[in-house]
């Protein structure tokens, strides 16, 4: 599996992948349509942020968006093609995002989790530290992971 920077012209395909990924869970078609309208994955966003894709056999199988803010990295998106769920792609993308965040000086990785994916994120070492209201009217868990500090020790969220 290759992980590489996304290209701006892939924004539409990545947004469609996110909708397919969300559709893996038991959401209604109406909810998925509302979700699609909230996506802000434009060519400009891809070009100006840390957006990386995973490819298997030259086909995009997932992606993540990583934002950087004063020692904190925010995993803004992590989505997989439904066929990739449970095949290790999510783990590889998450580990890549955490390592990339640490390499850029972040001490903590934080994200708002898809509720159906909380178990995955807990297996990755994430802990729920709060809750936030989503634009879609749901409560989402806010999760954090301490990253390797400059002395090699893990920081706590």
Residue locations for each model-derived region?
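Conserved acetyl-CoA pyrophosphate-binding loop and the N-cap/start of the following alpha-helix
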Residues: 84, 88-96
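A short beta-loop-alpha structural element at the N-terminal edge
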Residues: 2-16
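Conserved GNAT-fold acetyl-CoA-binding loop/helix
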Residues: 16-41
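Conserved active-site tyrosine of GNAT-family acetyltransferases
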Residues: 121, 126
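A short helix-loop-beta-strand connector motif used in the catalytic cores of GNAT acetyltransferases and
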Residues: 42-53, 74
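Conserved GNAT acetyl-CoA-binding A-motif
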Residues: 101-114
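Conserved beta-strand in the GNAT
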Residues: 53, 59-67, 74-79
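Conserved catalytic-core motifs of GNAT/GCN5-like acyltransferases
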Residues: 71, 110-112, 127-145
